[in-house]
Curated annotation (Swiss-Prot):
Membrane topology of the entry: Multi-pass membrane protein
One GO location term (cellular component): plasma membrane
Protein family membership: Belongs to the UPF0761 family.
Protein name: UPF0761 membrane protein Veis_3782
Top-level taxon: Bacteria
Entry keywords, A to Z: Cell inner membrane, Cell membrane, Membrane, Transmembrane, Transmembrane helix
Location relative to the cell: Cell inner membrane
Transmembrane segments annotated in the record for this chain: 54-74, 111-131, 151-171, 192-212, 226-246, 261-281
Length: 417
């Protein structure tokens, strides 16, 4: 009786999953990706990251080889990592050539002195800091982590990342080889899990990137959604590029033996576009699932949103909940959380709004602070907010300020009665 029960449970779960997929706002997601790609100039950003990546490839590879060379016991991990890079991140048509060039360059770079190695290390860190700034821009984060903290975190990622990744891949290779052919006789579902390791490693890496790099709370389920999006698109892009190069060998005909370089440039650009779009998916997934109805394209939108935030915080000032989280404000105002970030930072800078007692929404997610109204509406002039978000007071605008009475308005005048 357990088998029919298990099948029925699986059928219900599959049906629920298909229902969720059918209700997902695919059209709105595509529109958001198109809008953000154009408005945030992600194509130009991907070009910049492509150039920086080309400069940083050899430094990254040199640091990774230095780590493995310093610990000869990890030689098998190095082979596993190189094999994964060849089969997962680069199209087959150029993978082995690129790996051969990188190994050759890195071997020569390892003979540099301290000054030369420092230059390579700075180049590698420059790429990482560029990624950090780009992702924080997508999440509309105004305040980055301290530079020293970022450098320490990313240095640890550069040195320990290859070891951990190589260890996981080598362990799987060992299981496959030590099984004596048993793995080949396992059920198709288990074999599929082994075959999907490369896909999941890439998805997990992207999820870690989207969860930890932005200096703002990012839920794990949203980060994993972005990671799976990137892994799927990378696989599709690899197959599409391989198909194109096989059917239309333009680069090989024109460039001959040098065709690897332009193909590598095209691939790195495509990969960065996918990674940036994955970040957009992760950042905007909360608003997409919530069905945001207000995009805020009119002039003065930020000022209007600030007034609405003040009204909502004033409404709950005596409630036992002690303020509202950014997600709650976004839901009440039917806007994207990312639109609220600069507004809340402006109100906090004016000391009108404060953060209190971070709340853990889910055990696996970072705590979210609550925002409370600190200013007294009866004695606080609205002029600083008007000056900051709407209209600066200048000599030419003085008559408008005086006749409109903008300098005399108090916060209480714009709050709901």
């Amino acid at each position: 009786m357990s088998l029919p029960f298990s099948l029925s449970v699986a059928a219900r779960r599959i049906e629920a999953l298909l229902g969720d997929l059918s209700r997902f706002p695919w059209k709105t997601t595509a529109q958001t990706l198109r809008e953000r790609f154009r408005a945030d100039h992600l194509g130009l950003t991907a070009s910049s990251l492509t150039f920086t990546t080309i400069l940083a490839l050899v430094p990254f590879f040199t640091v990774a080889l230095a780590v493995f060379t310093a610990f000869p016991i990890f030689g098998q991990l190095q082979d596993a990592l190189q094999g994964w890079l060849v089969s997962s991140l680069v199209p087959d048509s150029i993978a082995r050539q690129v790996l051969g060039y990188l190994t050759q360059f890195a071997a020569k770079a390892s003979g540099l002195g301290l000054a030369g190695f420092s230059v390579l290390l700075v180049t590698a860190l420059a790429l990482i800091l560029t990624i950090d700034r780009t992702l924080n821009d997508i999440w509309r984060v105004q305040r980055l982590r301290p530079l020293g903290q970022r450098v320490l975190i990313y240095w640890a990622a550069i040195t320990l990342g290859p070891l951990l990744l190589g260890a996981s891949l080598a362990l799987t290779s060992y299981v496959m080889s030590a099984s004596g052919g048993l793995v080949k006789r396992l059920p198709d579902g288990v074999r599929f899990l082994f075959d999907s390791l490369q896909f999941m490693v890439l998805a997990a890496g992207m999820a870690l990137l989207y969860h930890y790099v932005p200096n703002t709370p990012v839920r794990w389920r949203h980060a994993w959604s972005g990671g799976l999006f990137v892994a799927l698109c990378i696989e599709l892009a690899k197959k599409a590029l391989a198909l194109y190069l096989g059917r239309v060998p333009t680069y090989s005909v024109v460039y001959g033996a040098f065709a690897t370089l332009p193909i590598l440039l095209v691939w790195i650009y495509m990969a960065w576009v996918i990674v940036l779009l994955g970040a957009v998916v992760t950042a905007y997934l909360p608003s997409l699932l919530a069905g945001v109805a207000r995009r805020g394209t009119v002039a003065g939108w930020t000022f209007q949103l600030a007034l609405e935030v003040l009204q909502q915080l004033h409404r709950v000032r005596h409630d036992a909940g002690k303020g509202l989280r950014a997600g709650q404000l976004a839901q009440l105002l039917r806007v994207d959380v990312l639109q609220l970030e600069p507004v809340l930072e402006s109100l906090t800078a004016l000391d009108w709004v404060g953060q209190v007692s971070a709340v853990v929404v889910a055990a696996s997610d970072p705590p979210e602070p609550r925002y409370v109204l600190l200013a007294d509406p009866q004695s606080t002039l609205l002029e600083p907010l008007v000056h900051k978000l709407l209209l600066e007071r200048s000599e030419s605008l003085g008559p408008l300020w005086d006749k409109a009475g903008l300098g005399r308005l108090q916060m209480a005048d714009v709050l709901a009665r």
